[in-house]
UniProtKB/Swiss-Prot annotation:
It comes from the Eukaryota. It comes from Homo sapiens (Human). This is Brain mitochondrial carrier protein 1. It is a multi-pass membrane protein. Solcar repeats lie at residues 42-131, 139-224, 233-323.
Amino acid sequence: MGIFPGIILIFLRVKFATAAVIVSGHQKSTTVSHEMSGLNWKPFVYGGLASIVAEFGTFPVDLTKTRLQVQGQSIDARFKEIKYRGMFHALFRICKEEGVLALYSGIAPALLRQASYGTIKIGIYQSLKRLFVERLEDETLLINMICGVVSGVISSTIANPTDVLKIRMQAQGSLFQGSMIGSFIDIYQQEGTRGLWRGVVPTAQRAAIVVGVELPVYDITKKHLILSGMMGDTILTHFVSSFTCGLAGALASNPVDVVRTRMMNQRAIVGHVDLYKGTVDGILKMWKHEGFFALYKGFWPNWLRLGPWNIIFFITYEQLKRLQI
């Protein structure tokens, strides 16, 4: 759990630095002050709302990705059977055997996760960018990647308990029993705090990769399309930029995502040794026992989720910005 002190320190530094910039902005000009104060809360609110909308719209695809990733574990008898041949086969079989509502198993903790993770992720990312540069035109890929990595690690670590519950509900489907709050309590009583933050390291690593790739790729693609004169600041530009960043994020994150999913699905049992002790250990074991392409299990549903998810998210986010709610 040594990751927390460093993350908390980074978070506090960001908060103090943001406060310092806001004070400085007040001293320089009223315009800059207004802009910085807006960045204090609007990206947080817009990011959270857009994340919830995108999560609900793409959740069935995310569930099939989880089922595909946890199956075929030769060293875990519970998930040794290969039940699903692909994304569409998984969708039809889940509907047939468990009912249509099973496609939304784990939706409650998923929405709760996005309300926290999505809110913090976008808010910190946008605030950090303004600490480095004041104008959008001055942003660079490197600056945006650094901001994305930091915001991804902080937000995913805070939201990890909701992710653990979502993964378990998705993997076990109709076999999972209990309410969301009751399940949180049950995990805490049986596995302790470590159970709620099980898989936090690969989760933070995946978030660092996904956010560190997706948000900068979106910003740079959008900036290039607009400044080059190819497109204006329109929904089509937002669509192309979000589609591109979704593909880039899926390619970069899938191996870590598979390991993260399996680690979170592990239960703490007396006398039982965890199959995967960490990200590197998980990748090496999967490669050894299941082959290299096991690291890209669930890639198509992962991409087909990240693509539409990012499209829905960024279009919703951009429209909320224009509405100036």
